[in-house]
Amino acid sequence: ATEGTLGNPDITWERAKKYDVGIEARMFRDRLSITADWFREDRRNILTTLGTIPGIYGVATSSVPPVNVGVTKNQGYELLVSWADQVGDLRYSLSGDISYARNKVVYKAEAPNPYYWMNETGFSIGQRLGLVSDGLYNTNEELANRPYNTYTANRASLGDIRYVDLNGDGLIDNKDVAPIGFPNYPEY
């Protein structure tokens, strides 16, 4: 027999508070239409697996029961502007819209990391992670003074990407992996 995931009789539904403020306006005999919305959603009690139990205890994270501890925030705005008119027998309409939304992991039960950039808490949901670039190697002097790169067995040539040693330990390794670029969900 094998041991499976433990149950948790105390789990509950996730909770969400949503706020939405909108304005709609029509002008110039209803030819110009403007719609603007601002929204915010705060979610708490998100069901997640605790990442705070060290592996030294011999308990696999997959066998730990899920608990309601996650907290996220999402907010943004939407703006739609439309113009509709008629010239003779020709009817036309033009419209354009823009939306912006940014989310953030406010709290996630995760193991302590030595550097803040290694956490999910404080960053966007689905944030991409990778090595931070500081341009390209342009001179032999830059190549000679670079940190040891554990990902490439320290091979580098002129024109290769120059990565940043974020923690200053002289190595380019998994402790230098940080949030880069935009998250998986576009903001605009």
In which residue ranges do the predicted regions lie?
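Short amphipathic alpha-helical segments, especially helix-boundary/capping motifs
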Residues: 1, 51-58, 165-168
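Membrane-embedded beta-barrel scaffold of Gram-negative outer-membrane proteins
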Residues: 13-58, 92, 99
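Flexible, surface-exposed loop regions and adjacent strand-edge segments
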Residues: 50-61, 109-119
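Conserved small-residue
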Residues: 67, 86-183
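Glycine-rich, flexible loop/turn motifs
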Residues: 2, 7, 43-46, 65, ...
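Outer-membrane beta-barrel signature, preferentially recognizing the C-terminal barrel domain
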Residues: 1-33, 62-87, 124-129, 181-187
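Active-site beta-strand/loop architecture of penicillin-binding DD-peptidases
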Residues: 39-45, 51-67, 175-187
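Short capping/connector residues at structural and topological boundaries
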Residues: 16, 52, 72-74, 136, ...
